[in-house]
Amino acid sequence: MKPYKIENIRNFSIIAHIDHGKSTIADRLLESTSTIEQREMREQLLDSMDLERERGITIKAHPVTMTYEYEGETYELNLIDTPGHVDFSYEVSRSLAACEGALLIVDAAQGVQAQSLANVYLALERDLEIIPVLNKIDLPAAQPEAIKKQIEEFIGLDTSNTIACSAKTGQGIPEILESIIRLVPPPKPPQETELKALIFDSHYDPYVGIMVYVRVISGEIKKGDRITFMATKGSSFEVLGIGAFLPEATLMEGSLRAGQVGYFIANLKKVKDVKIGDTVTTVKHPAKEPLEGFKEIKPVVFAGIYPIDSSDFDTLKDALGRLQLNDSALTIEQENSHSLGFGFRCGFLGLLHLEIIFERISREFDLDIIATAPSVIYKVVLKNGKTLFIDNPTAYPDPALIEHMEEPWVHVNIITPQEYLSNIMSLCMDKRGICLKTDMLDQHRLVLSYELPLNEIVSDFNDKLKSVTKGYGSFDYRLGDYKKGAIIKLEILINDEAVDAFSCLVHRDKAESKGRSICEKLVDVIPPQLFKIPIQAAINKKIIARETIRALAKNVTAKCYGGDITRKRKLWDKQKKGKKRMKEFGKVSIPNTAFVEVLKME
């Protein structure tokens, strides 16, 4: 590390919508500052997971320290990369809290999108210096002036310092580096000498345990210090080493001082011990007050995960345990289903988080899994005054005991070209949405503000929005309050037996159509047996939809050649009695594909 000067440190973040070129610009910055040699360079260098590269998204926040010579001075530039997706908004807010400035990357052809809007507002709340950057300026469809106007009018940013760049060709990259040095303020000199450091991420390393990523606000942290976490008020730990991101995590001598970004190791074994947003201080000279803004991360969406082959249960348990080491937001609880066997009830930050975990389980651990339909946390107010929070249909109490139910709602911002307005309005109406306001973003695009039940968002809202806007619509959401709703438990009965894997909590208005579609799907995927199988959807024991799988025909009179009809009748009667007995005592074997197909549909 170069000699320490707080006035020569710049901590900044990059805000962008998915696919607007954030990771590519980060790559060009690393190249221009010679942080990484050309031969070691690869696409999306900071996105370390294959999944991040394939999907073109950032899942984990990745910091990196660069040095840059400007007007005879050496500057330390700390890029604290943030996830762009709405599921990880708390991580984004903590990463932004570690910065003094941010680059707002906007695609010069597509313009401002919903998720960049959400993160810009987070940055404005923290009073960060925002530098607008128009990327992909080399595209024939680029409209720099129109998009500058959008940024000015809708976000309210001064665009006089806007930089036109192309991460692909490298145009504009030196200007970005100079703007960071000129416009982003250095960290404020600390008012106190006690150590205060903000935890903005952590990473599990199999050799050294948890690496805690910090931005030092005041004081310094060095090897041998005894530290503690202020918000969680847990045990104390000895710092075994400190390091910087160059761009790989590299141990170093000396200390991390006010304004600097780095990490420390302290023999921590569980990610749960380290909470994002917490404040690190020393035991000997503790800080008086922790940093503001700490929140416990709580899961929003829940789903059951079961191995298709029950002998893989222990492997699945191990896989989830390993994923949890690097993902404190993932919650795991063991559960048992009559139909699916032993599995886990998992909590996620949102639908993208859930998809990523599923994909990593099948990819990194080579496991075939079944996942139940995602559900949210409902509030059940009982007649005796008690309140329950449930995320699983099996926990639904007796309807006679329920006073009312409440469901979580969200505030949604949708950005869309004008021609798709009526499509979106009918989609939101179908999803029980309430329109709050409509604003013009520019001559061609609108911003629609809606309130929607979270349950309607987690099922298929994103797919349907992309479908009705031909891929041009984007949205982001933030959690609102609970509201009363007519939520009921829909049960699916196969041969008069309820199958818990198919039961779900739905709004009363949607129950009949959902029940009918599940029954119709099951008729197609369950093979016929030797007896008729009724498939029914029921609410509170009342059947609301029914389909029947016809029995396989078996010709019992095949051996009768001619002769008296009474002989055939006897055989038919005997077969009828046998089928009746089979229906009473026969078990319907439901293939795994049936579960997969129905859950895919949900």
From Swiss-Prot:
<feature type="domain" description="tr-type G">
    <location>
        <begin position="7"/>
        <end position="188"/>
    </location>
</feature>
<keyword id="KW-1003">Cell membrane</keyword>
<dbReference type="Pfam" id="PF00009">
    <property type="entry name" value="GTP_EFTU"/>
</dbReference>
<dbReference type="InterPro" id="IPR035654">
    <property type="entry name" value="LepA_IV"/>
</dbReference>
<dbReference type="InterPro" id="IPR027417">
    <property type="entry name" value="P-loop_NTPase"/>
</dbReference>
<keyword id="KW-0997">Cell inner membrane</keyword>
<dbReference type="InterPro" id="IPR006297">
    <property type="entry name" value="EF-4"/>
</dbReference>
<dbReference type="GO" id="GO:0003924">
    <property type="term" value="F:GTPase activity"/>
</dbReference>
<dbReference type="InterPro" id="IPR013842">
    <property type="entry name" value="LepA_CTD"/>
</dbReference>
<keyword id="KW-0648">Protein biosynthesis</keyword>
<dbReference type="GO" id="GO:0043022">
    <property type="term" value="F:ribosome binding"/>
</dbReference>
<comment type="function">
    <text>Required for accurate and efficient protein synthesis under certain stress conditions. May act as a fidelity factor of the translation reaction, by catalyzing a one-codon backward translocation of tRNAs on improperly translocated ribosomes. Back-translocation proceeds from a post-translocation (POST) complex to a pre-translocation (PRE) complex, thus giving elongation factor G a second chance to translocate the tRNAs correctly. Binds to ribosomes in a GTP-dependent manner.</text>
</comment>
<keyword id="KW-0342">GTP-binding</keyword>
<dbReference type="GO" id="GO:0005525">
    <property type="term" value="F:GTP binding"/>
</dbReference>
<dbReference type="GO" id="GO:0003746">
    <property type="term" value="F:translation elongation factor activity"/>
</dbReference>
<dbReference type="Pfam" id="PF00679">
    <property type="entry name" value="EFG_C"/>
</dbReference>
<keyword id="KW-0547">Nucleotide-binding</keyword>
<feature type="binding site">
    <location>
        <begin position="135"/>
        <end position="138"/>
    </location>
    <ligand>
        <name>GTP</name>
    </ligand>
</feature>
<feature type="binding site">
    <location>
        <begin position="19"/>
        <end position="24"/>
    </location>
    <ligand>
        <name>GTP</name>
    </ligand>
</feature>
<dbReference type="InterPro" id="IPR005225">
    <property type="entry name" value="Small_GTP-bd"/>
</dbReference>
<dbReference type="InterPro" id="IPR004161">
    <property type="entry name" value="EFTu-like_2"/>
</dbReference>
<keyword id="KW-0472">Membrane</keyword>
<dbReference type="InterPro" id="IPR035647">
    <property type="entry name" value="EFG_III/V"/>
</dbReference>
<dbReference type="InterPro" id="IPR009000">
    <property type="entry name" value="Transl_B-barrel_sf"/>
</dbReference>
<dbReference type="GO" id="GO:0005886">
    <property type="term" value="C:plasma membrane"/>
</dbReference>
<keyword id="KW-0378">Hydrolase</keyword>
<dbReference type="Pfam" id="PF03144">
    <property type="entry name" value="GTP_EFTU_D2"/>
</dbReference>
<dbReference type="InterPro" id="IPR000795">
    <property type="entry name" value="T_Tr_GTP-bd_dom"/>
</dbReference>
<dbReference type="InterPro" id="IPR000640">
    <property type="entry name" value="EFG_V-like"/>
</dbReference>
<dbReference type="GO" id="GO:0045727">
    <property type="term" value="P:positive regulation of translation"/>
</dbReference>
<dbReference type="InterPro" id="IPR038363">
    <property type="entry name" value="LepA_C_sf"/>
</dbReference>
<protein>
    <recommendedName>
        <fullName>Elongation factor 4</fullName>
        <ecNumber>3.6.5.n1</ecNumber>
    </recommendedName>
</protein>
<dbReference type="Pfam" id="PF06421">
    <property type="entry name" value="LepA_C"/>
</dbReference>
<comment type="similarity">
    <text>Belongs to the TRAFAC class translation factor GTPase superfamily. Classic translation factor GTPase family. LepA subfamily.</text>
</comment>
